[in-house]
Amino acid sequence: MSRLPPLEPPYEPGVEDRLSAMMPPGVPPILLFRTFARNMPMTAAMDGWGRYELSKRLSLTLRDREVVIDRTTARCRCEYEWGVHVAFFAERASLTDAQISSLTCGDATDPCWPHDRDRLLIEAVDALHDTADVSDPAVGLAAGDPAGGVLL
């Protein structure tokens, strides 16, 4: 049982509208958002951030973003969040079953990663997780971005 259980319907006035706005049409709100909704001011603030992080305005491509999120959630054992991203975004990010498996329990040297960029993203996540630092090659991903948005 969760120490901080998510809200369950029926929701207080305003909560259902906020939760519906955070999900695609017709999709019930995920457990994470229902837990956030225990603090509506925080939920409202995170909604804007989430819309940016999951949008085309983000400095990472959809594929880059999902490689990073899937690897991070796997390394941190955030099974629920990993499952949400694999279910909602893996196909759109063109991640193969072998790549999803590698992000979960493999590494950047697995043969399913033919592109340097994918391997560097995985290495960057692993370095941050293991050492709280990023390697010079991973920092190099941001070299073409004068504002450093990719690295951020």
Model segments located where?
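Conserved alpha-helical segments that form or flank metal/cofactor-binding pockets of metalloenzymes
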Residues: L60, R65-Q99
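Mobile cap/lid helix-loop segments that border enzyme active or cofactor-binding sites
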Residues: M1-L62, P111, L120
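Acidic/histidine-rich alpha-helical segments that form the ligand environment
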Residues: W113-L152
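Short acidic alpha-helix initiation/capping motifs at coil-to-helix transition points
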Residues: M23, M42-G48, R77-G83, L128-P137
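Short amphipathic alpha-helical segments and their helix-coil junctions
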Residues: A44-L58, S102-A108, S135-G144
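Short alpha-helical scaffolding segments that buttress acidic/His motifs in well-ordered protein cores
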Residues: F36, M46-G50, V67-T73, L103-D107, ...
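Histidine/lysine/aspartate-rich catalytic loop segments that bind and position anionic ligands
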Residues: A90-H115
